[in-house]
A protein has these predicted regions:
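Glycine-rich nucleotide/cofactor/substrate-binding loop typically near the N-terminus or early
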Residues: 58, 66
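Structural signal for conserved beta-strand scaffold positions within catalytic alpha/beta enzyme cores
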Residues: 39, 57, 75-78
Length: 102
């Protein structure tokens, strides 16, 4: 099974694009199957999060994704949104790396 991943930041422009590139590197390193990685602003992310398997957002905005979390989406908050190491650690801790193993 391949994952659909959403990465969201405040404006959905530069930082979320860099988060997307980080997610691409990390999921490849973990040998995860990924159908798509979409980047957007937090507001778009909140309304579309249920359509994804995994959502990455800054830690201080995590509460905005409670509905998605209740619906079974793996919601991951990041302290440093551009850290490969943190993203990798959180994917492993959450079980997502194993669940979506290629």
């Amino acid at each position: 099974m391949n994952a659909k991943i959403l990465v969201a930041c405040a404006n959905g422009a530069g930082t979320s694009l860099m988060m997307k590139m980080t997610a691409e590197r990390v999921t490849q390193k973990l040998n995860m199957g990924v159908d798509k990685i979409h980047h957007c602003a937090l507001s778009e992310g909140v309304s579309s999060a249920r359509q994804y398997d995994i959502v990455f957002a800054p830690l201080n905005f995590l509460n905005m994704y409670e509905d998605a979390k209740k619906a079974g989406v793996i919601v991951i908050g990041l302290r440093n949104v551009l850290s490969d190491a943190e993203m990798e650690e959180k994917l492993v801790e959450s079980g997502a790396a194993e669940k979506f193993s290629a």
